[in-house]
Amino acid sequence: MRVAVSGFKGRMGHEVVKTVLREADLELVAVLDHEPKEKNINEMVEFSSLDVPVFGNLSEMLEEIKPDCVVDFTTPKVGYSNTKTILEHGVRAVVGTTGFTPEQISELRTIAESKKIGALIAPNFAVGAVLMMQFAQKAAKYFPNVEIIELHHDNKLDAPSGTGVKTAEMMAETREFVKQGAADEVELIEGARGAEYEGMRIHSVRLPGLVAHQEVIFGAEGQGLTIRHDSYDRISFMSGVALSVRKTKELETLIYGLENILD
């Protein structure tokens, strides 16, 4: 498959480039940066042996290169518009950018189905993180008192993380509604109890040195349960990205969540 990478200078995008180069059945045909200084990726020392054009305009890249799939790891500010542009050009998309609303996902799914092309948006591409979310969903049926703590590097722009929100959404499907905390609790400092989703609390931590981590803490009388996943290196996401790229060939719709393509 001929693959282009949008946001290739970001930490995740950079790792995606290396992953595409490693995979025998994937070919890197173009990269995109919002303000490129280079015309070819070989102007970067790490990729000096390659011949891959660098673009600053997404539509121009799609029309000139005509890739089979674009992998997008950019920012919440442009993630939706990028994905819409990719799909409207009839190109498959794998998107790790977060911050999509349910309405945006629905609209993008409609475009994908009208073009009969596959696309996948996932808050997290680490298989371990997907399992963590599935375990939490199952536990929430029996432990409705639960809070989420998600921890990421301090350059992450959105909070809560897509993984935190997706976990809460999945737990809400099986969990009896409980408004977490005392009915008359008072925040001495606004925001101390975190964000609220369907009665659950989500807390976001941003610190240098972190990559992507999350724990889901359940409490009940006389017992507690903690489910935690840690990504220590961004390579933990790459097997999921490669799988998703290949899977788009089999799809004619947009899938939200890596768990929906795992056997």
UniProtKB/Swiss-Prot annotation:
The active site is at H152, K156. (S)-2,3,4,5-tetrahydrodipicolinate binds at H153, G162, T163. It is found in: Cytoplasm. InterPro entries: DapB_C, DapB_N, DapB_N_CS, DHDPR_bac, NAD(P)-bd_dom_sf. Its main location: cytoplasm. Pathway: Amino-acid biosynthesis; L-lysine biosynthesis via DAP pathway; (S)-tetrahydrodipicolinate from L-aspartate: step 4/4. It is an enzyme of class 1 (oxidoreductase). Keywords: Amino-acid biosynthesis, Cytoplasm, Diaminopimelate biosynthesis, Lysine biosynthesis, NAD, NADP, Oxidoreductase. It comes from the Bacteria. The keyword NADP applies. Coiled coil: none annotated. One of its GO terms (biological process) is diaminopimelate biosynthetic process. Its EC number is 1.17.1.8. It catalyses: (S)-2,3,4,5-tetrahydrodipicolinate + NAD(+) + H2O = (2S,4S)-4-hydroxy-2,3,4,5-tetrahydrodipicolinate + NADH + H(+); (S)-2,3,4,5-tetrahydrodipicolinate + NADP(+) + H2O = (2S,4S)-4-hydroxy-2,3,4,5-tetrahydrodipicolinate + NADPH + H(+). One of its GO terms (molecular function) is 4-hydroxy-tetrahydrodipicolinate reductase. It holds the Pfam family DapB_C. One of its GO terms (cellular component) is cytosol. NAD(+) binds at G7, F8, K9, G10, R11, M12, G96, T97, T98, A122, P123, N124, F125. Belongs to the DapB family. Catalyzes the conversion of 4-hydroxy-tetrahydrodipicolinate (HTPA) to tetrahydrodipicolinate. NCBIfam families: dapB. This is 4-hydroxy-tetrahydrodipicolinate reductase. It comes from Listeria monocytogenes serovar 1/2a (strain ATCC BAA-679 / EGD-e). The lineage of its organism: Bacteria, Bacillati, Bacillota, Bacilli, Bacillales.
